[in-house]
């Protein structure tokens, strides 16, 4: 379904809940909330490059500001004086707790306190509903306990759990921590929203795109562009099989890190996706062949930004760059890899609308 159609459906849907999206990025969470029928009135993010995709696709106000500088009265102004229930949504940057940062000390990073800034804004604005999405390891961090304590003190009914993307139609193995909090009653997070055994795959998501060689671009879609590979990485890709590892290669193709005793820790590096399975978690480095299992299942290249966006669950015509702006893989990597998959926003949005229709206490 085209994104223009989703926007039309959103305009026809119930506007009983109005959302402000903190740390909105390019709009993944907002996209899912809109798909569920929630009206998104604004997004806030410190990255100015996210303004165009957010405003273009979500058709809501983008506020270029650090969440640290935002106040509850600012949020009141964004929500306005309507009769809608207020939802404050967001995904604070997760780098301190990410499984990609092996051995990182969360106390050595400043980003962890953004969750407490989120909690401050909840206390200052007292929205009817709150939702947060983040990495699963955050669940055991002291800062998360502090955040929960603040919500409970304010009188919120709270639910949170680790959610698997494949249980909600995402063609990706991503697991995330999802939280709901409500002043209107308990909002349970569903375990799954697709039938048991129904799994979306890489083939389902990207098989219909035109084939490309490494370094080529689809003339009809600038985001369907494959990063060039070095000669040795092209040889490595040719020697790889879907679902395999670098152990399938001849010795001369193996990197120095693979020859060390610790090399067994990097089984998925230089890996190739399988057609009939979900993709691995899409990270900001999906365009780098050596950074994970990001090889295309049969074409001798890494996945493109468009393919990464589809594996994240974005609509096929979601736009990330203004017309004529050159593709920068690092910028798009952050936009797409850091995005909340819309499927997670949609499952929370539907749960909140169900709670509005049938409140429980």
Positions of PLM-derived features:
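A broad, structural surface signal
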Residues: 52, 145, 149, 204, ...
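Proline-centered helix-kink/hinge sites
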Residues: 92-93, 127, 171, 315, ...
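Core alpha/beta nucleotide-donor-binding catalytic domains of modification enzymes
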Residues: 3-129, 136-149
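Class I S-adenosyl-L-methionine
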Residues: 73-84, 95-269
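Aromatic-acidic/polar surface patches that form glycan- and anion
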Residues: 22, 136-140, 168, 172, ...
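Short hydrophobic-aromatic micro-motifs
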Residues: 90, 178-181, 280-284
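C-terminal target-recognition/interaction regions appended to catalytic cores
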Residues: 224-361
């Amino acid at each position: 379904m085209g994104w223009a159609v989703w926007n039309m459906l959103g305009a026809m849907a119930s506007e009983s809940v109005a959302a402000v999206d903190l740390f909105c990025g390019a709009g993944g969470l907002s996209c899912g909330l809109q798909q569920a029928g929630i009206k998104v009135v604004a997004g806030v993010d410190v990255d100015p490059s996210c303004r165009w995709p957010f405003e273009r696709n979500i058709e809501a106000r983008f506020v270029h500001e650090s969440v640290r500088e935002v106040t509850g009265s600012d949020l009141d102004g964004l929500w306005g004086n309507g009769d809608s229930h207020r939802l404050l949504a967001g995904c604070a940057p997760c780098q301190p707790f990410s499984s990609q940062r092996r051995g990182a000390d969360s106390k050595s990073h400043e980003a962890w306190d953004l969750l407490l800034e989120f909690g401050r804004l909840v206390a200052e604005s007292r929205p009817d509903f709150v939702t947060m999405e983040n990495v699963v390891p955050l669940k055991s961090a002291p800062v998360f306990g502090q955040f929960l304590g603040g919500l409970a003190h304010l009188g919120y009914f709270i639910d949170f759990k680790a959610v698997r993307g494949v249980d909600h139609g995402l063609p990706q193995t991503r697991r995330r921590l999802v939280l709901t909090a409500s002043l209107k009653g308990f909002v349970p997070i569903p375990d799954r929203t697709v039938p048991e055994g129904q799994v979306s795959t890489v083939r389902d998501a990207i098989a219909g795109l035109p084939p490309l060689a490494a370094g080529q671009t689809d003339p009809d879609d600038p985001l369907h562009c494959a990063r060039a590979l070095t000669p040795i990485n092209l040889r490595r890709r040719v020697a790889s099989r879907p679902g395999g590892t670098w152990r399938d290669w001849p010795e001369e193709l193996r990197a120095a890190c693979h020859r060390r005793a610790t090399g067994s820790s990097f089984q998925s590096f230089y890996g190739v996706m399988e057609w009939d399975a979900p993709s691995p978690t899409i990270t900001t480095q999906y365009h780098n062949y050596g950074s994970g299992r990001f090889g295309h299942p049969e074409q001798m290249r890494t996945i493109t930004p468009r393919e990464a966006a589809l594996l994240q669950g974005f609509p096929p015509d979601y736009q990330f760059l203004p017309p004529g702006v050159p593709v920068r893989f690092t910028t798009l990597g952050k936009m797409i890899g850091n995005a909340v998959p819309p499927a997670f926003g949609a499952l929370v949005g539907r749960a909140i609308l169900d709670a509005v229709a049938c409140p429980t206490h």
